[in-house]
């Protein structure tokens, strides 16, 4: 295996549950052999390797070589060292296009045809057109490709999908709410739209993806969105951990609220509200799916996921909870199984094409909200 990126998504952080390497170790055990770790900051790569070599997973990293970039690594690959899968947790600014320096998918398709590739979300920070170009280029050239929309792998998400399928439900409406606790969100790049692309594309993308997963394809031209901008009266954030006025250019500050509605291709209606408002650490997240006779309510997706189901004939809600559910592990295990056995490709729940559609959806919401802001400013 090859791991791209020595940062928190691949090697863990006290801030959250993400840590792909530890799930790979759990899935593969002694069969895991990481031949390369690619990161432009060699000290970071060496640091995580020292930690791994001092752990019970030492044998998986004993011979891992460090490379500054994909070009340097690919120049060394032989038939004996050709990887089965490349695990990409590097920032999205360095992938998702056909432009040199941001074309890691193209490089892998050309140099290692048939290799499996896992990518974190969002697929890029480039344009939607660039991402669609990549989608077309890698089709049929790479092996299994999985993108890290891990909330699809929650057992409550799968139960919700099963209920829709088993009962042949025609979804009427999807309503998603994503309210973040911002007090400890100190990374200034997140608050800068020129770097993060804003909270819908960078963060609410998970719920936009679930909205597509449960409701179907969205008519992008139907999207209407409003936002609460940093300069509007209710936008003050009393617990912001840094001086936004001194650190973030006014035109790049993120909206405090984004509220969007849309039509699905099926005719159903969808909505999303992303809010930067809560103090403390825990987010409020909830997504409702309605069909004739049914209310399906997925709550607290990040902390303690629960699915509440109301069915025809009973006004009381059924409650579904699953102990020790690790969607990150299910995501990793599904990818590895698909790489090792082509008959298991259905275990991958988000393909590159699927993730590209979610990316286009999030950009359409941002553009719609910006158009609304611009229109209000033009009004006399």
Where are these regions (language model features)?
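N-terminal Rossmann-like dinucleotide-binding module
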Residues: 1-57
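Predominantly a Rossmann-like dinucleotide-binding segment in NAD(P)-dependent oxidoreductases
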Residues: 7-9, 151-249, 372
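Short amphipathic alpha-helix with an adjacent loop that forms part of the alpha/beta core around
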Residues: 70-83
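Short acidic-hydrophobic, aromatic-tinged amphipathic segments that line or gate anion-handling sites
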Residues: 59-73
């Amino acid at each position: 295996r090859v791991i791209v990126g020595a940062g928190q998504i691949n090697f863990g952080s006290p801030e959250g549950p993400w840590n792909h390497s530890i799930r790979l170790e759990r899935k593969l055990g002694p069969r895991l052999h990481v031949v390369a770790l690619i990161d432009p900051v060699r000290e970071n790569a060496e640091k995580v390797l020292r930690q791994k070599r001092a752990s019970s997973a030492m044998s998986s990293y004993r011979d891992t070589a460090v490379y500054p970039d994909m070009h340097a690594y690919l120049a060394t690959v032989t038939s004996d060292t050709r990887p089965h899968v490349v695990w990409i947790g590097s920032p999205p600014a360095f992938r998702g296009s056909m432009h040199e320096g941001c074309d890691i998918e193209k490089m892998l398709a050309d140099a290692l045809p048939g290799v499996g590739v896992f990518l974190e979300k969002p697929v890029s920070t480039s344009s939607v057109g660039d991402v669609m170009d990549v989608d077309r280029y890698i089709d049929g050239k790479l092996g299994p490709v999985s993108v890290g929309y891990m909330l699809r792998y929650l057992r409550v998400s799968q139960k919700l999908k099963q209920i829709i399928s088993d009962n042949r439900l025609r979804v009427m409406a999807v309503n998603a709410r994503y309210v973040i606790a911002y007090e400890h969100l100190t990374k200034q790049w997140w608050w800068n739209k020129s770097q993060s692309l804003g909270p819908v594309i960078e963060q609410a993308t998970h719920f936009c993806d679930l909205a597509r997963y449960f409701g179907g394809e969205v008519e992008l031209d139907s999207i209407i969105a409003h936002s609460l901008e940093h300069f509007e009266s209710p936008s003050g954030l009393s617990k912001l951990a840094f001086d936004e006025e001194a650190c973030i250019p006014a035109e790049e500050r993120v909206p405090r609220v984004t509220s969007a509605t849309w039509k699905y291709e099926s005719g159903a209606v969808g909505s999303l509200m992303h809010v930067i408002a809560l103090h403390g650490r825990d987010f409020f997240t909830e997504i409702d799916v309605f069909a004739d006779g049914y209310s399906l309510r997925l709550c607290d997706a990040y902390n303690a996921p629960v699915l509440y189901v109301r069915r025809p004939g009973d006004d009381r809600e059924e409650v579904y909870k699953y102990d020790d559910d690790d969607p990150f592990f299910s995501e990793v295990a599904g990818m590895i199984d698909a790489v090792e056995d082509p008959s298991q490709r259905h275990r991958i729940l988000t393909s590159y094409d699927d993730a590209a559609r979610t990316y286009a959806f999030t950009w359409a919401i941002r553009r719609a909200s910006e158009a609304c802001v611009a229109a209000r400013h033009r009004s006399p």
